[in-house]
């Protein structure tokens, strides 16, 4: 009985800690000229030196965090950056936009056959209105804050990883590094990529939502053209590879190196 209460108490304290860390992110809503809007959360370095510029991380969430509450997008990944130790060691700006409930970052709708049959991601397709808003929000942020344009990074999980690779392909001169966790892309895009972005892919080997072959093939395609790319595969991990990815010893170190 005592052990049960202790566990409940520990969970309670952990929840308070997570909530406090998420509160470090300010809330905002980006509105374009046509009055289209997108909620986002924004983290700034705890201490900023005058005249110094800092990195920025654009983080794109997965399908499970869609909505308009401006909270859910922090569920997976938010505390990676707001954790006090990491915030001290890696001072940076972090941007977490939120995709609408019924929408997808890079697709007008989810592929009818999911991601297991062929490659449902077209090579040539117009940018979605949601990713366009993300790019506009990013550009506005870069113009407003002391951000080093040579240290703009992008990360994403699942649906957000698909969007990460989409954004890098569309804007090859914007991102210094890209992290894709259990994502997918059209392989021809990777073969044709001309930018200098460095890539790191994470994927679980038994992913039953987005097959691991997408990341394996993307890695091989980039590697074959001489790009700087790394690939980490988690044995026995399903479509939640962000958990071991975030706990990889050099997850942030690689990005900020």
Question: What residues fall within each predicted segment?
Answer:
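Primarily recognizes the serine-hydrolase "nucleophile elbow" in alpha/beta-hydrolase
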Residues: 139-194
């Amino acid at each position: 009985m005592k052990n049960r209460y202790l566990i409940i108490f520990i969970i309670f304290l952990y929840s308070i800690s997570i909530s406090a860390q998420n509160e470090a992110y300010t809330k905002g809503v980006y509105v374009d000229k046509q009055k289209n809007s997108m909620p986002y959360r924004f983290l700034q370095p705890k201490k900023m030196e005058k005249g110094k510029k800092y990195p920025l991380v654009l983080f794109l969430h997965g399908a499970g965090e869609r909505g308009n509450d401006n909270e859910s997008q922090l569920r997976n990944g938010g505390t990676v950056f707001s954790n006090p130790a990491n915030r001290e060691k890696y001072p940076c700006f972090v941007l977490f936009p939120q995709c609408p409930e019924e929408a997808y970052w890079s697709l007008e709708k989810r592929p009818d056959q999911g991601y297991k049959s062929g490659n449902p991601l077209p090579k040539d397709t117009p940018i979605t209105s949601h990713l366009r808003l993300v790019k506009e929000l990013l550009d506005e942020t870069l113009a407003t804050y002391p951000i080093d344009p040579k240290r703009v990074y992008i990360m994403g999980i699942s649906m957000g990883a698909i969007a990460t690779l989409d954004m890098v392909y569309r804007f090859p001169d914007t991102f210094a590094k890209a992290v894709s966790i259990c994502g997918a892309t059209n392989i021809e895009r990777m073969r044709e990529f001309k930018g200098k972005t460095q890539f790191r892919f994470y994927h679980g080997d038994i992913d039953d939502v987005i097959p691991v072959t997408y990341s394996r093939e993307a890695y091989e395609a980039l590697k074959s053209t001489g790009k700087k790319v790394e690939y980490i595969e988690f044995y026995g991990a399903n479509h939640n590879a962000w958990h071991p990815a975030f706990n990889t010893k050099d997850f942030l170190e690689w990005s900020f190196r």
